[in-house]
Amino acid sequence: MDIIVMPTAAEAELLTARIIADAINAKPFYKLGLATGRTMENVYANLVKMNKAGKVDFSRVISFNLDEYVGLKGTAEKNKDSYRYFMNYHLFNHVNIDKRNTHEIGRAHV
């Protein structure tokens, strides 16, 4: 594994998005493990821009979220505290990913 140090957070976020986009472009049925949180917000924003510009196609990507809260009220998609809501808000609702191919830990499985 290479460790790449970038001069600024913005450059690191853009490079991360480019690495993800390159991986998807090389293998369209790419499987992504996705994280949430502030660190990823700008990475996802860059991926959205790349998708809108036709530089990456999410249509066949399969994603797995790494975490979810236990005991949230209501549906994960509508609860602003859930990671599903976070992913929809920051990425899934803005790119051409098939939401049937987006997966997270279900509350029934925890």
Report the location of each language-model feature.
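N-terminal glycine-/serine-/threonine-rich phosphate-binding loop
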Residues: 1-32
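Ligand-binding beta-strand-loop-alpha-helix segment within the catalytic cores
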Residues: 57-107
